[in-house]
Amino acid sequence: MPLSLSTNTLTKNGSAGSGTFQDVSNILLAEAIDNIEPAAPNKELVTNITIPSGHYQVTVPIYGRTTAVALSEGVDISPVQGPEIANVVTQTASEHGVMTFISDRLAYQGNDDAVAIVGEQHGRAVGRLLDQDIIGLFDGFSNSIGSAGAALNLNSIAVAVSFLRSDDSTYGPAPNPINASLHPEQIRRLITDVAGQTNSITTFGGEPIPTGLSEDIVKNYMRGRDPLFGVPIIESPNISRDGSDDAKGAVFSTRALHLAIENEIRAEEERDASLRGTEIVTVGVWGQGETVDVWGVEMLGDAVSLS
């Protein structure tokens, strides 16, 4: 059921004006685009692919590795068949959206606040869904580090990074950039480990914080995207916790996952005379998937909140 807004829902702000319904869509779209990025940090961590008009899917070929050999003078070089395609990934897109009904009375009274709120809610809702769709891919990585009930630590990140950068499979080491997308509570435990502190709300700072790298990391905590082992640590609040308060983040190359976008976001309105109002619809069309499995590592760890 769509969200319904009327004059009984919000206080009037501003005076009546002409061209109300035309203005509604313009204001809404601006607000929706403005609010989609903060709600979906993982979108910029994966490969974004545009599905061109007239196409219903995209095909992504993944090329394998070619081997060079030492040569002998006067001896012909054996040809290498190529380029070798190690895998082909196809991706389609589907619609995702939300609708809100705004009554005539609210619109006629020039309540621009109602429209702005609708835009904010729509943008955050679509962005949150897109983010959750990408996060849902983390569980698909075959390689996993950590365990339920145990906190991730500095060594967890080091192991993940070293695996991605030294893998010698068909696809080769994971290409840069590599990012870590983790639950806020997983990140807090990393900082606690770096600082040499006890994982407690009352005892942080009870032990001296080592100078150097540990001190810098603690000072810059929550500044955002400070790297560990050259990998930016991204806070992803949309990562959910299971019934045991464990969360699954990931360390992965941008090229490990992809997001195919047909229509990123659009807002439209439709007059409903019998309901005496206007329906505002915001829709995004996308599909997401895994490109190369060994270029990502799932990070499982305790994410319970301290009380």
Regions found by a protein language model. Give the residues of each.
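N-terminal "assembly arms/tails" that initiate or stabilize quaternary assembly
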Residues: 1-88, 294
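Extended, solvent-exposed, turn-rich assembly/linker loops in the middle of proteins
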Residues: 140-221
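Alpha-helical scaffold segments that mediate packing/assembly in large oligomeric complexes
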Residues: 103-173, 298-307
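Extended serine/threonine-enriched, polar tracts that run as long, contiguous segments within proteins
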Residues: 219, 225-243
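Short acidic, glycine/tyrosine-flanked loop/strand segments centered on an H-E-D-like triad
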Residues: 83-109
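Signature of extracytoplasmic/envelope-associated structural regions
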Residues: 2-19, 23, 32, 50, ...
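Protruding loop/beta-arch "assembly-hinge" segments enriched in small, turn-prone residues
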Residues: 1-39, 224-226, 240, 247-307
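Short helix/loop capping segments that flank catalytic or ligand/cofactor-binding pockets
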Residues: 68-71, 110, 189-192, 199, ...
